[in-house]
């Protein structure tokens, strides 16, 4: 039955989407994700240092195909519930899944150290399992995975890259936080008010550019707890601030204040070369690793125009599939009931990835 692998991939894709959104999985569909799995917390050495990671393994398939799933900018790292649910669902489809922790991104720093960890993780998993591995990166991790795949050192270890809600050019994303707009490749403009989260991550990463050096140690915990969305801890951290520090912290948290916007613009100018080093833009025209691009139409942290720019730059032989979907926001499924066609397009896109991941 030549059509069965594609049919199975579509059933698995539908089941995975149901599982991660907390919806019941129909019995006939659930059989496609019925492999019992085990998890194992591990560490492995790399040139980037010891990497903490978790393996999700289908118990009855010791030689199953492989997939790395990279977490986004979140303090829970590989323990973030959406990530663990997705990794477990993919493993139940018969994939060996590795989720390496990216210490920089876990601490709200998008930097070159994470590119190194991503490349080293792909190399370690490829050597352990005997062949190149698929790599799925969420949010900024997806863009960094593309940079790692373009590195000649790590390129042979990448089977494909799936970038979900990821950046093409960091300076464009930083400018979006200032303006709520971004130009698309076709000349139209994406207009969507930016979520505060993206600007807050920039502030946290470059706090020395926003407050005096003497105030950094006191203000950073306030900003950190605000990013964690822990209001009680944020209030507790504010107690130790003096009046000047309290005013500085509140100004930072108000990402639309004129003073904060001026500082954000200054940071974009000051760190432009660093941002270029964290951007797939300029590296994609010669990339030969197969690429899948997925973005939420309503993404207000990294705008969907970023995926359109990546698709515009990638060679046609490299770009396997691209979808900007109204079913997704940033990394979450939208709460509103999607249309049947939009839901099917997302299922089909994920099925293409499942089929690629399942090929040894």
Predicted features along the sequence, with ranges:
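Short beta-strand immediately N-terminal to the catalytic nucleophile in serine-hydrolase-like folds
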Residues: 135-138, 162-164, 294
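Short, surface-exposed "cap/lid" segments of acyl-processing enzymes
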Residues: 59-90, 101-102
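Gly/Ala-rich beta-loop-alpha elbow adjacent to hydrolase catalytic centers
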Residues: 137-145
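Short beta-strand/loop motif that positions the catalytic acidic residue
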Residues: 287, 293-295, 299
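N-terminal cap/lid segment of alpha/beta-hydrolase-fold proteins
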Residues: 14-62
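C-terminal catalytic histidine-bearing segment of alpha/beta-hydrolase fold enzymes
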Residues: 175, 237-276, 281, 308-312, ...
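Catalytic nucleophile-loop/oxyanion-hole region of alpha/beta-hydrolase
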Residues: 78-86, 99-134, 149-152
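Alpha/beta-hydrolase-fold enzymes
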Residues: 147-241
């Amino acid at each position: 039955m030549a059509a069965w692998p594609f049919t199975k991939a579509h059933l698995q894709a539908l089941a995975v989407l149901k599982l991660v959104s907390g919806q019941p999985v129909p019995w006939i569909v659930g059989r496609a994700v019925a492999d019992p799995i085990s998890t194992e917390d591990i560490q492995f050495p790399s040139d980037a240092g010891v990497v903490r990671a978790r393996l999700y393994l289908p118990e009855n398939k010791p030689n199953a195909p492989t997939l790395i799933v990279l977490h986004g900018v979140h303090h829970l790292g590989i323990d973030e519930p959406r990530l663990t649910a997705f990794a477990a669902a993919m493993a139940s489809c018969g994939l060996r899944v590795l989720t390496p922790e990216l210490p920089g991104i876990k601490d709200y720093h998008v930097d070159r150290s994470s590119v190194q960890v991503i490349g080293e993780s792909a190399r370690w998993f490829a050597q352990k399992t005997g062949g190149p591995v698929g790599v799925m990166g969420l949010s900024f991790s997806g863009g960094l995975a593309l940079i790692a795949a373009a590195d000649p050192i790590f390129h042979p270890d990448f089977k494909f890259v799936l970038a979900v809600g990821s950046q093409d050019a960091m300076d464009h994303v930083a400018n979006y936080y200032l303006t709520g707009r971004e130009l698309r490749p076709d000349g139209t403009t994406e207009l969507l008010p930016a979520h505060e989260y993206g600007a807050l991550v920039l502030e946290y990463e470059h706090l020395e550019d926003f407050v005096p050096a003497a105030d950094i140690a006191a203000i950073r915990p306030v900003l950190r707890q605000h990013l964690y969305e822990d209001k009680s801890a944020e209030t507790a951290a504010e107690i130790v601030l003096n009046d000047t520090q309290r005013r500085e912290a509140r100004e930072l948290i108000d990402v639309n204040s004129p003073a904060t916007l001026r500082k954000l613009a200054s940071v974009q100018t000051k760190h432009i070369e660093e941002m270029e080093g964290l951007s797939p833009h300029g590296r994609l025209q010669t990339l030969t690793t197969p690429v899948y691009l997925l973005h939420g139409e309503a993404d207000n942290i990294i705008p969907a125009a970023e995926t359109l720019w990546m698709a515009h730059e990638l060679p046609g032989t490299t770009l396997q599939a691209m979808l900007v979907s109204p079913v997704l926001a940033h990394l979450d499924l939208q709460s509103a009931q999607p249309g049947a066609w939009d839901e099917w397009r997302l299922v089909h896109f994920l099925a293409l990835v499942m089929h690629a991941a399942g090929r040894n």
